[in-house]
A protein has these predicted regions:
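A Rossmann-like FAD-binding core segment of flavoenzymes
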Residues: 127-177, 193, 199-209, 214, ...
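Glycine-rich FAD pyrophosphate-binding loop
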Residues: 100-116, 243-251
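N-terminal Rossmann-like FAD-binding beta1-loop-alpha1 element of flavoenzymes
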Residues: 77-103, 227-235
Length: 307
């Protein structure tokens, strides 16, 4: 339909199975998922599914007059969803398309979960997330913010209120630490905390109650997409040198190729085949350096990645 120029029909086809096309078109690893299975890739480049999806979603978003969103009449069954991240929003959209009455309970004051507090503005503009959520609301999905299920209300109370099923989409909120000396020093942040404070709470502002300190040298441990986000955010916060320390080589980087290229273009320095063993501090308890141990690649593990 895109090739035919019928972008409205293309949008209808995409949204029949995907409630977040503008988001997925920007941040999903299509090269490892749908595009990797494209038969056109056998003799050349795969169809740019992600970019086409993004184009169609943006075309629809920028239309002055939008078609009314078609949803079936309510079937009378109520579903509660805990959390408003991508899994919850997708679940809400799919259930609403099947006729269920859906209510999302979100602990934060803004909806979107990791799409809002985890992924930086330069990679996923917040107005894009807001527009996708507005589409769900137009379909009849209800969202209640500042509601912590387990404290504001329990799951049992949701059932007592008439909900027939509960989807738990609370996310993987706890960071994974390295368990090395110095993790509790001043100046050590989990990527989760850094990105949440910067993206959602605007802690880069000087008038913020507990502002993020501006550092000259930053080392990010790990090399997934979240690590790339943390490194690029640190650069934007004014860090002169930002390093990524990763225990494997470049071929083993878990981040999307596109994200690695962006990081390199922005001056992020990679310290590959280096594993952190300790974090050091001065007399004031503030970080002064990180100790790395040089690594060598071994045999592939059960997933095919070299150890």
């Amino acid at each position: 339909k895109v090739a035919e120029g019928d972008f409205d029909a293309a949008y209808e086809i995409i949204t029949s199975t995907n409630s977040l096309p503008a988001v997925c078109g920007r941040v999903c690893p299509q090269e490892k998922q749908c595009e990797s299975k494209c038969v056109r890739g056998i003799k050349g480049e795969s169809v740019g599914i992600g970019r086409l999806e993004r184009f169609v979603a943006d075309y629809h978003m920028n239309k002055e007059v939008k078609d009314e969103i078609k949803v079936p009449e309510s079937n009378g069954h109520r579903i509660a969803i805990v959390g408003s991240g991508p899994a919850s929003l997708t679940c809400a959209g799919d259930l609403r398309k099947m006729g269920y009455d859906v209510t999302i309970f979100e602990a934060f004051h803004k909806s979107g979960g990791v799409l809002v507090y985890g992924i930086p503005q330069f990679r996923l503009p917040k107005e894009i997330v807001a527009a996708e959520i507005d589409n769900l609301k137009a379909m009849g999905v209800k969202i209640i913010n500042n509601a912590i299920i387990g404290k504001s209300e329990t799951v049992d109370e949701l059932f007592e209120d008439g909900f027939e099923a509960v989807f738990i989409g609370s996310g993987a909120g706890l960071p994974q630490f390295l368990h090395i000396p110095g993790e509790n020093l001043l100046g050590v942040y989990s990527a989760n905390e850094l990105l949440t404070r910067v993206n959602l709470m605007k802690a880069y502002r000087d008038d913020y109650d507990t502002p993020i300190k501006h550092f000259h040298n930053v080392c990010v441990v790990g090399a997934g997409n979240v690590a790339m986000d943390a490194a690029r955010v640190s650069k934007r916060l004014g860090a002169e040198h930002v390093y990524i320390a990763y225990r494997r080589g470049k071929d083993e980087l878990p981040a999307r190729k596109e994200e690695v290229e962006h990081a390199e273009a922005e001056g992020i320095e990679f310290r590959l085949l280096n594993n952190p063993v300790a974090i050091h501090a001065g007399e004031d308890g503030h970080v002064t350096g990180i100790e790395l141990q040089k690594q060598e690649l071994g045999e592939p593990d059960e997933k095919g990645r070299r150890k």
